[in-house]
Swiss-Prot record:
A single GO BP: symbiont-mediated suppression of host innate immune response
Stretches the record annotates as Disordered: 1-37
Record family assignment: Belongs to the tombusvirus protein p19 family.
Gene3D superfamilies the record matches: RNA silencing suppressor P19
Protein name: RNA silencing suppressor p19
Pfam families linked to this entry: Tombus_P19
Keyword Signal: no
SUPFAM superfamilies: Tombusvirus P19 core protein, VP19
Species assigned in the record: Tomato bushy stunt virus (strain Ja9) (TBSV)
């Protein structure tokens, strides 16, 4: 079952992840179902004393068209296969189709938001710039998920500046 949240409910439920979302609904921009953890699973992976801590099992993302908001929680374990899967959770075509259901003669605001491990990125614009908004959202999502703080290590931090190659001398 797909849930579109309207008006003040969207703001009140902006941080809520506990709802059942179906995949590929007729108006949904998302191609994957909601994968929110169960209440028990959520409690096992979160510290109740720190309400700002994200669940390390995945990330949340949303698309908003005017007053209508579609949300997903997706599992992500920071492997290449998992990254490839979640990058396909929506496409420019699926977003365009979903957004077109809410467009009238006037321009409406469109917003993409993603939150992963305490970092939140929001990209917004008007419905006339939706294609550019989708491109920026895809780039933001990919960069955020690939640059997880634990995995960030540049060539410089390993003592080898970019563009420098190391050659070993063959022994005789």
């Amino acid at each position: 079952m797909e849930r579109a949240i309207q008006g003040n409910d969207a703001r009140e439920q902006a941080n809520s992840e506990r709802w059942d979302g179906g995949s590929g609904g007729t108006t949904s921009p998302f191609k994957l179902p909601d994968e929110s953890p169960s209440w028990t699973e959520w409690r096992l992976h979160n510290d109740e004393t720190n309400s700002n801590q994200d669940n390390p099992l995945g990330f949340k993302e949303s698309w908003g068209f005017g007053k209508v908001v579609f949300k997903r929680y997706l599992r992500y374990d920071r492997t290449e296969a998992s990254l490839h899967r979640v990058l396909g959770s929506w496409t420019g075509d699926s977003v365009n189709y979903a957004a077109s259901r809410f467009f009238g003669f006037d321009q409406i605001g469109c917003t993409y938001s993603i939150r992963f491990r305490g970092v939140s990125i929001t990209v917004s614009g008007g419905s006339r710039t939706l294609q550019h908004l989708c491109e920026m959202a895809i780039r933001s999502k990919q960069e955020l998920l690939q640059l997880a703080p634990i995995e960030v290590e540049s060539n410089v931090s390993r003592g080898c500046p970019e563009g420098t190659q190391t050659f070993e001398k063959e022994g005789e």
